[in-house]
Amino acid sequence: MSTHRALIENQPLKRLGLALLLAFGGASGVQAQSLQELYDAARAFDAIYLAAAALADSAQYKAAQADALARPSVGLGLTGSHQRSDIPSGMTVNSDLLQAGLTAKYAVFNRGNALTISQAQRSLGAARTDLEAAEQDLIVRVAQAYFDVLAAKDALSTTRASKAAIAEQLASAKRNFEVGTATITDTREAQARFDLATAAEIGADNDLRIKGVTLDQLVGRVGVLPKPLAVPVALPAVMPVNVEPWVSQADQQHPSIRKARLGLEVAQLETSKARAAEGVTVDLTGTLGAQHLQNSLSGQAATTSGAGNTKNASLGISLNYPLYTGGATQNRIMETLALEEKSRNDVDFARRSVSEGTRRAFFGVQSLTAQVRALEAAESSSKLALEATQLGYKVGVRVNLDVLNAQTQLFTTQRDLAKARYDVVVNGLKLRQAAGQLNPADVAAVNQLLAK
């Protein structure tokens, strides 16, 4: 009995290492991609980000349209006409008129135009915050998809290692049963675990395929192979270590709060513009024109004609002051005041939402970091427990089921530890996103954690 049981001593640990080598070394002929490389690819491919970039690009041209209100406008007009008149004496009068004119207008004083320009600048700022938010979202989506693939690869590797260890345990149980040193129960228990491991392997393999497709579609490539974390894994610490500095930074920097504040400023300017509609506007106008008139008189006896050219120029100031608008201006002011209050509440909602999200993200990273430390300790203790259980099985004080349970515990712990490490990295990025601090430099920082 001891001879057969000795065959399985330390086999699960050895098989885990072999399975991991096969999983990550089997694709050695394919060049693995870093997070930085895939993020750069996604910036040039992701439709959501590119749409946000195009929208932000269009906003600058919309702002330029508003700037035109502070500049003069010049127009050129050209008209031509022909008129024929028959008079009772039998004569016919033909008149040909050609006119050309140049008109110019400049708003010397128009409070509404100045406010519109200010609104356009703030709308441009809001569009830029949207682009910043889209960039942060892209970083998180790429990182999430990247580490989801790595987690799925690790899950498949540990599942296969567990299956290999169970297969060895099953073979040992069968041999022991054949020589009469074990009952059929050991064999059936091992067979049941092996069948479950096979099902788990199928599910893990499919999950890896799905996660791979998600990453491929995000970066516009096929068969992406992410680089794993460098060993030993060195996870970055969360700094500052207290939540309040994160919340304070989020209140100042988060794109949604900045956009809401800009929206409030636009609403306040709209109220000022509505009030400005009650004021005076002064325009400087000028015209320069020329006309050519040719007349001809024809009848039964003779035909006579004449032509003349005239030129004209004018320069003037136009002053407008609305005396009565039927209540439209007053109601417009009331409308904008209500919209201003709505924007003020939007700011409050954005601040509360961001504060809550930042706290959730901070505590989530703290919890995950503690989980990693606990799982690292659990991995060490699970290895020792498996070795002790194997030794107990060898000397006859442990049964086959105990070994299977110890194996399952070790492989489950290793899978959960790998996933928790990835979650710490991704949620660290999400924390910086929640605080409005996430930028491409953070991608480079995470990239340093990967294997070279």
Feature locations, PLM:
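A glycine-/polar-enriched beta->alpha junction
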Residues: 40-50, 57-72, 101-119, 128-136, ...
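Periplasmic alpha-helical coiled-coil/stalk elements that build and connect Gram-negative outer-membrane
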Residues: 2-3, 14, 137-249, 361-364, ...
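Small/polar, glycine/serine/threonine/aspartate-rich low-complexity segments that form flexible
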Residues: 77-108, 230-240, 272-273, 285-332, ...
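Cleaved targeting-peptide boundary
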Residues: 30-40
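Gram-negative bacterial Sec-dependent N-terminal signal peptides
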Residues: 2-31
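Amphipathic alpha-helical coiled-coil scaffold segments and their short linker/junction regions
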Residues: 39-46, 187, 221-296, 303-306, ...
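Amphipathic alpha-helical coiled-coil segments
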Residues: 51-66, 134, 138-157, 168, ...
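Metallo-beta-lactamase
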Residues: 204, 255, 420
